[in-house]
Amino acid sequence: LCPCYAFRFFSFINFINFSIMNFPIISSLILLPTIGALFIFFTRSSSKYQSSKYVALFISLANFLLSLYLWYIFDKSIVDFQFVENREWLSGFINYKVGIDGISILFILLTTFIVPICIISVNATVTNKLKNFLIAILLMETMMIGVFCSLDLVVFYLFFEAGLIPMFLIIGIWGGE
């Protein structure tokens, strides 16, 4: 193998890392489960809901891989927040500001690791309204990642309070089974 191929490969990796800096990767990490939940909501329900389970599993695994990539490109020598996205919201009073630091990346990895395990183990625990359960799980994943990434107090509060709704539904409907 010629060393020039190794150089090309590493320059390709550096190109990916350089081009990802302008991409809103944290917003993608937050919105991907919501898009999956909307897709499951608008699909026709089959008799066994297996297609919904596979879609939810695919979305959650894609989110886990995205968080692994985020952990890979995370610079552990920087103490400050990284991948910060700041959008003005509500006439400058409230900003949609998200970013990650060393602790929040670990919580994001934990969240995106546990959700596919929950979706895989859903056959043994959930017997009714599986489609609604999967939508609630994906929405709760969105809200938890939003809580761990938020840098604005109002955005944190909105993600935290919105995360209580699917959690309440999961505990209330499927908690006694």
Cite the ranges covered by each PLM segment.
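Cysteine-centered motifs
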Residues: C2-C4
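Juxtamembrane/membrane-water interface recognition
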Residues: S11-N14, F41, W174
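Transmembrane helix-loop-helix hairpins at membrane boundaries of multipass inner-membrane proteins
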Residues: N17-I25, F39-I135
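Alpha-helical transmembrane segments and their immediate interhelical/interface regions
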Residues: M21-F42, S150-M167
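Residue-level recognition of transmembrane alpha-helices
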Residues: I30-P33, A56-I59, T111, I137, ...
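Hydrophobic, membrane-inserted alpha-helices
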Residues: I35-A37, V115, L139-M144
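Alpha-helical multi-pass transmembrane bundles of energy-transducing inner-membrane proteins
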Residues: S47-Y49, L139, M143-E177
